């Protein structure tokens, strides 16, 4: 079962979060039929969105979008406060080979921007954007948190893809210091992080999320919260129809005149919906 653990280093002002989301990323891989570079990129963005979701309040959502000039083009993951996540990659059939014995996600992403959109339950979304620093996702998220959110943060994300393309390990961790954090603790954590093995390696060794945090920081953790990560897409035919309404009466009339059923496929879960001409006529009368 995929999980997330959120806590504090005991007696210190340091927030720590870790997630293992191997099953979720493997489920997404199967839905989108991704090749290794696309799988690794999507998996990292999924893990990153879960880490950021740990800071949300009830019923809030967050979307992480990576938009680059590399062959992947766009990678998106959305997570809510219940750690329900969904994702897609614009070009799923991409494999760029290895770099330093790891899947070369940076070359697949290229140069571009990281966009974070927060749905806080208000009338408008809160959106911020930073330029990609490496395209490897983890450092880009850390840069976003440091620059846009003004929160000193360290982020590590990892996805291990087997030769048969299946996902053997996926997850990540995030460490955030606060203004009250002692300088000695910051320096200690910096040293520990420089010695830390990769996230995917720790998952492959059988560590759970709490054990990963304890391994990374080397200090006792006070657990604040545990949650379960699941892949979930809330799309419905009603939502499809509502989207068609936004096109306006003129566009709907054109669809009716063409006399063809409207076929819609959800980006996130690949579920297909059909809206018949008769349904379009009823819709036009109601708006």
Curated annotation (Swiss-Prot):
Q: Name one Pfam family in it.
A: HSP33
Q: Where in the cell is it found?
A: Cytoplasm
Grouped into one coarse class, the protein's main location is cytoplasm
An annotated GO BP: protein refolding
Which keywords does this Swiss-Prot/TrEMBL entry list? Chaperone, Cytoplasm, Disulfide bond, Redox-active center, Zinc
Gene Ontology cellular-component terms listed? cytoplasm
S-S bridge residues: 233-235, 266-269
Extent of the signal sequence: none
HAMAP family named among the record's database cross-references? HslO
| Family statement | Belongs to the HSP33 family.
Alphabetized PANTHER family for the sequence: 33 KDA CHAPERONIN
Q: What is this protein called?
A: 33 kDa chaperonin
Q: Origin organism of this chain?
A: Thermodesulfovibrio yellowstonii (strain ATCC 51303 / DSM 11347 / YP87)
Q: What broad taxonomic lineage does this protein's source fall under?
A: Bacteria, Pseudomonadati, Nitrospirota, Thermodesulfovibrionia, Thermodesulfovibrionales
């Amino acid at each position: 079962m995929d999980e997330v653990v959120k806590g504090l280093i005991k007696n210190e002002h340091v927030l720590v979060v870790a997630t293992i989301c191997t099953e979720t990323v493997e489920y997404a891989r199967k839905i989108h039929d991704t090749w290794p570079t696309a799988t690794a990129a999507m998996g990292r963005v999924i893990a990153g969105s879960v880490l950021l979701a740990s800071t949300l309040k009830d019923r809030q959502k967050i979307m992480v979008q990576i938009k680059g000039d590399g062959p992947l083009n766009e990678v998106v993951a959305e997570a809510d406060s219940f750690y329900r996540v969904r994702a897609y990659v614009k070009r799923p059939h991409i494999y760029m080979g290895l770099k330093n014995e790891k899947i070369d996600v940076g070359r697949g992403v290229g140069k571009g921007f990281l966009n974070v959109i927060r749905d806080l339950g208000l009338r408008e979304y809160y959106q911020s954007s930073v330029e990609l620093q490496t395209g490897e996702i983890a450092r880009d998220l850390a840069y976003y948190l440091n620059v846009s959110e003004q929160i000193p943060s360290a982020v590590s994300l990892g996805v291990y893809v087997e030769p048969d393309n299946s996902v053997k390990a996926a997850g990540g961790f995030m460490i955030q210091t606060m203004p009250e954090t002692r300088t000695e603790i910051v320096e200690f954590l910096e040293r520990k992080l420089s010695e830390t093995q990769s996230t995917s390696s720790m998952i492959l060794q059988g560590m759970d999320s709490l054990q990963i945090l304890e391994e990374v920081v080397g200090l006792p953790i006070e657990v604040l919260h545990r949650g379960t990560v699941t892949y979930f897409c809330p799309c419905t035919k009603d939502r499809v129809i509502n989207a068609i309404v936004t096109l306006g009466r003129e566009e709907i009339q054109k669809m009716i005149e063409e006399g063809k059923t409207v076929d819609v496929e959800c980006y996130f879960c690949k579920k297909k919906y059909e809206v018949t001409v008769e349904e379009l006529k009823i819709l036009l009368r109601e708006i």
